[in-house]
Design a protein with these regions (language model features):
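N-terminal secretory signal peptides that target proteins for export/translocation
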Residues: 1-3
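Bacterial N-terminal signal peptides
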Residues: 6-19
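Extended surface/linker regions that mediate inter-domain or inter-protein docking
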Residues: 25-68, 76-136, 141-150, 155-173, ...
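Beta-propeller blade signature
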Residues: 61-68, 122-136, 181-202, 242-274, ...
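Catalytic cores of eukaryotic secretory-pathway lumenal/extracellular enzymes that build
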Residues: 93, 101, 107-116, 124-132, ...
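Beta-propeller domains
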Residues: 207-243, 259-386
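Eukaryote-specific, cytoplasm-facing alpha-helical/coiled-coil scaffolding segments in long proteins
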Residues: 251-257, 317-326, 402, 525-526
Length: 669
């Protein structure tokens, strides 16, 4: 039901209606922004997009509704927020709208304020707001969400099934203010710390995923799964490659407040990333890792994994090998037969198709230069579908996945924020360009090569093509202090981004982690009360991890050893002739915020995660024969270990000497 019919009308309200291209579509909400050509850690970038400073996000944007008849309404202006002309203290920027299950309210992120005078330096934060009274003749009301972390940036919210709000924040892990901001594992720039869950009425705040390089764009699908993009970047610090002291990288003794700053840049895991690393082994290949993968979890943070356990062996076009001295270990360059024929490195801005549950649209885009815009793709991944049966389907032509200075005729420009609608229409924000963006104006009068407009897409041959924009364009004159320069946009056509359909949706059943039958049987045989164990874990902020047989591995992963046996045991899995590797221990690493920059005398704010042997848990049996932070693998290949809850973790299987044999490539929790 449209908003015209769903909401009682009031004739005495203030509303702003603008002419729009009258294409019959469901009601949608979207945001506008002044064109902002910079694309490194700015509001529409692939990472570092959470900052609210003037260099990261221009002021002057708004929150709009496009009603089904094409009428446009500026919700923020009608509610008394934002302005045209000089922005000053009333200037706003808006992002990330999400519609409630009932369709009668919207949560979004907004920053309020900009300098009122030149050189005025203030701190600004993205905060979460709700808007109600969405009818065409109603005056909308905007309120700030209660009990959110007001000292930090809160973005990308979504309504949970139980009225909790799941969102992205840069609040530091464990609330450790002295580690703020968390720095990513690539550029060591400020990033968010992952997904959080807030109960606004009580203030109960839970860190769902401690993400060392950040989480992005959560949604809840029709099956009740939280679906999001995670930046997976588990590698050694490139700002410390070969002990490069230009960045002044050093470690703290721990992440505790007051911990000693050490004259050390030691890194332990994973393996080296460059030839010049003094700790490298001649038999080990250099390692780097950089993917934005689709992930899933339950609303309480349990059962977190890549969607349907898909990974780079199903998605990537190239995977390097780990060891040089084993003919069975080889790099992957597309030589294996697999279902998925469209390789993607990054999968951004995921939206489920309301017409085909379990079908997910997203954007395959480069990391830099295009404001996270690129090719529209989709994958079918309902919960019961095996990862190796999932195929990525090209919606727009593959040429649109990246920039090209001499494009083919198939390169029809870049898309972002794909939105499949309940009437079967596909819309997205589209820019007619094939190049990386750059400022073609000046610092005082920025101009972008990109002109993001909301457009419907239609199938033309094998691929979808953009049609006429669904608005006639929204223009605005804006100025604000940077704070050094007066930045001006004169009658500029605003970008139209992040469209969401306003409709009622069936509330999915809330998912909970289910204890598998084999583990349940073990607990029963051992006389362990599962409820008591769960209470113990909760009280001690712990999790319990298990494996049934560590010698069994993914058949597609020929980049690490497949022939494994448990040291001193007959338990083994042999996939081919050749070298057999013994494994004796599982060495667990926890992500500690101990890496800082600027040197001991000019230390910069913020910390990067480094993998450190498990040390914050004392409940595991001792394993003096194994490496630090390890547990022994049982003769049948099984293992169990207590680990810290809500803390980034990774691991490796080692031999008796503590040398890595098989390494996990992702941060888990």
């Amino acid at each position: 039901m449209g908003l015209r019919a769903a909401i009682t009308l009031s004739l005495s309200v203030l509303f702003l209606a603008l002419s729009s291209t009258a294409v019959a579509l469901p009601d949608i909400v979207f945001v506008t922004q002044p064109p902002h050509p910079d694309d490194f850690a700015t509001v529409n970038a692939t990472f570092g997009s959470h900052r609210a400073s003037l260099d990261a996000v221009p002021r002057g944007g708004d929150l709009y509704i496009r009603y089904s008849d094409g009428t446009l309404k500026n919700l923020t202006a009608a509610a008394g927020y934002g302005k045209s002309g000089f922005q000053g203290a009333q200037g706003i920027a808006v992002r990330d709208p999400a519609v409630h299950w009932s369709g009668i309210k919207i949560i979004f992120s907004m920053v309020i304020g900009s300098p009122t005078a030149q050189y005025q330096v203030e701190t600004y934060r993205w905060q979460l707001y709700e808007v109600i009274k969405l009818g065409i003749t109603e005056t909308p009301q905007i309120t700030k969400l209660a009990n959110q972390p007001t000292s930090y940036n809160n973005v990308m919210p979504v309504y949970g099934t139980d009225e909790r709000i799941i969102f992205v924040s840069d609040r530091p892990q464990g609330g450790q203010v002295h580690t703020y901001p968390q720095r990513d594992e690539y550029e060591s720039t400020a990033t968010n710390s992952g997904l959080w869950s807030l109960h606004p009425a009580s203030g109960d705040l839970i860190h769902l995923d401690h993400a060392p390089s950040g989480d992005f764009s959560p949604t809840i699908d029709s099956f009740g799964r939280v679906i999001f993009t995670r930046w997976d970047h588990l590698q050694r610090d490139q700002q410390n490659r070969c002990s490069n002291q230009g960045f002044g990288a050093f470690n703290y003794a721990s992440e505790q407040a007051g911990a000693a700053a050490l004259d050390s840049d030691q890194e332990l895991y994973p393996e080296q990333r460059a030839q010049c690393d003094g700790s490298r082994s001649e038999n080990i290949e250099n390692h780097s890792f950089n993917h934005f993968l689709p992930w899933q979890m339950n609303e309480d943070g349990t059962d977190m994994e890549t969607i349907n356990h898909i990974g780079r062996h199903e998605l990537a076009s190239y995977i390097p090998k780990t060891f040089r001295n084993d003919v069975n270990i080889e790099e992957f360059y597309g030589q294996y037969t697999r279902v998925n024929q469209q390789a993607v490195t990054n999968f951004f801005q995921i939206q489920e198709d309301p017409v085909i549950p379990g079908s997910y649209f997203g954007i395959s885009a480069p990391e830099f230069g295009t404001h996270a815009s690129g090719q529209i793709v989709k994958m079918s991944a309902p919960p019961t579908k095996a990862a190796d049966q999932i195929a990525v389907i090209a919606i727009t032509h593959p040429d649109t996945s990246g920039p090209d200075a001499t494009p083919s005729v198939a390169h029809i420009g870049f898309s972002r924020d794909p939105l499949p609608l309940s009437d079967g229409t596909l819309i997205a924000s589209h820019a007619v360009t094939s190049e990386d963006d750059t400022n073609i104006g000046s610092s005082a009068s920025p101009a972008s090569k990109y002109n993001f407009r909301l457009k419907s897409f239609a199938l033309s041959g094998q691929y979808y093509m953009p049609a006429t924009p669904i608005t006639t364009g929204i223009t605005k004159t804006i100025s604000y202090w940077s704070p050094d320069l007066l930045v001006s946009y004169n009658n500029v056509t605003m970008w139209e981004l992040q469209a969401r359909e306003i409709r009622t949706r069936a509330l999915p059943a809330r998912l909970h982690a289910i204890l598998p039958a084999p583990e349940g049987a073990v607990f029963q045989q051992s006389g362990v009360d599962v409820a008591e164990l769960r209470n113990y874990l909760t009280e001690n902020n712990l999790a319990l991890i298990i494996s049934r047989n560590v010698t069994r591995r993914d058949n597609l992963d020929h980049q690490q050893p497949l022939n494994l046996q448990v040291e001193g045991s007959t338990t083994r899995t042999v996939k081919n002739d050749g070298k057999l590797y013994s494994v004796a221990h599982l060495q667990i690493f926890q992500g500690d915020l101990i890496r800082a920059y600027g040197g001991l005398s000019n230390t910069q704010a913020g910390r990067r995660v480094l993998a450190q042997p498990l040390h914050s848990v004392s409940q595991n049996p001792g394993n003096r024969a194994g490496p630090n932070g390890s547990v022994k693998i049982a003769a049948d290949g099984s293992l169990a270990a207590f680990v810290p809850a809500r803390r980034a973790l990774t691991y490796q299987l080692t031999n008796n000497a503590g040398e890595g044999v098989v390494r996990e490539r992702l941060w888990l929790h």
